[in-house]
């Protein structure tokens, strides 16, 4: 799959994964259209990071869509009455940081945007190895959404489908950090923490996964 001179809509949250996807697309000489969402999340700082990453990689266009999922809550990320779990990733248990239908909604909006501007791909930072177990980050979900996308829009019906591009799907977090380093992602400008504080909490799942991977990456780097 070549991205050179192709148009791609990247769901850019400002975190490590989506920033790395943006860097890969940039290195591949794609025309990048960044899309982020102000969805009532408590960690709105990620929107500033997304804007910073968009400017860093000088992408074609960057939009922030207002879509308030906090109106019905259902997640500790959109309902401040719920506590963000800090006990670490639980096996076979989906944490309350899961936002009901979030990826389905976001990818659907990205699909509409991509079709409107005649983009060829939608870039997603989903990762099925070092993650919190969200159902909408899994390979089978991506496969089924691609089938839906092919049926649900004009380009799909004309046998010129918009493809979901998930370059990080089978990578662990340590490998993603290495890729980010190779592609000059300013990691200090990205935001992964679920809390709405000024600095990363270091306790939520997202912080734990990222920090553990970074320590492994640093340890391996120092061994070389």
Curated annotation (Swiss-Prot):
Keywords: ATP-binding, Ligase, Metal-binding, Nucleotide-binding, Queuosine biosynthesis, Zinc. Coiled coil: none annotated. The keyword Transferase does not apply. GO terms for biological process: queuosine biosynthetic process. It catalyses: 7-carboxy-7-deazaguanine + NH4(+) + ATP = 7-cyano-7-deazaguanine + ADP + phosphate + H2O + H(+). Pfam families: QueC. Pathway: Purine metabolism; 7-cyano-7-deazaguanine biosynthesis. Its cofactor is Zn(2+). Its EC number is 6.3.4.20. InterPro entries: QueC, Rossmann-like_a/b/a_fold. Zn(2+) binds at residues 193, 201, 204, 207. Binds 1 zinc ion per subunit. ATP binds at residues 12-22. It comes from the Bacteria. One of its GO terms (molecular function) is ligase activity, forming carbon-nitrogen bonds. It is an enzyme of class 6 (ligase). Belongs to the QueC family. Catalyzes the ATP-dependent conversion of 7-carboxy-7-deazaguanine (CDG) to 7-cyano-7-deazaguanine (preQ(0)). NCBIfam families: 7-cyano-7-deazaguanine synthase QueC. This is 7-cyano-7-deazaguanine synthase. It comes from Prochlorococcus marinus (strain MIT 9312).
């Amino acid at each position: 799959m070549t991205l050179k001179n192709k148009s791609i809509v990247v769901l850019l949250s400002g975190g490590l994964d989506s920033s790395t996807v943006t860097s890969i697309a940039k290195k591949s000489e794609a025309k990048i259209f960044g899309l982020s969402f102000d969805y009532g999340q408590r960690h709105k700082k990620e929107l500033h990071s997304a804007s910073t990453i968009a400017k860093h990689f000088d992408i074609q266009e960057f939009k922030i869509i207002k879509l308030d999922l906090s109106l019905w809550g259902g997640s500790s990320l959109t309902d401040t009455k719920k506590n963000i779990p800090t006990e670490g990733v639980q096996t076979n248990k989906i944490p309350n940081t899961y936002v009901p239908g979030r990826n389905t909604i976001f990818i659907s909006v990205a699909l509409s945007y991509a079709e409107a501007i005649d983009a060829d791909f939608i870039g997603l930072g989903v990762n099925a190895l070092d993650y919190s177990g969200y159902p909408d980050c899994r390979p089978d979900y991506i496969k089924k959404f691609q089938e839906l996308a092919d049926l649900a829009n004009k380009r799909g019906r004309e046998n010129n489908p918009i493809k979901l591009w998930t370059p990080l799907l089978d990578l662990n977090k340590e490998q993603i950090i290495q890729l980010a380093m190779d592609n000059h992602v300013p990691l200090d400008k990205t935001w992964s923490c679920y809390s709405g504080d000024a600095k990363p909490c270091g306790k939520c799942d997202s912080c734990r996964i990222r920090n553990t991977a970074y320590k492994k990456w640093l340890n391996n780097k120092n061994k070389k």
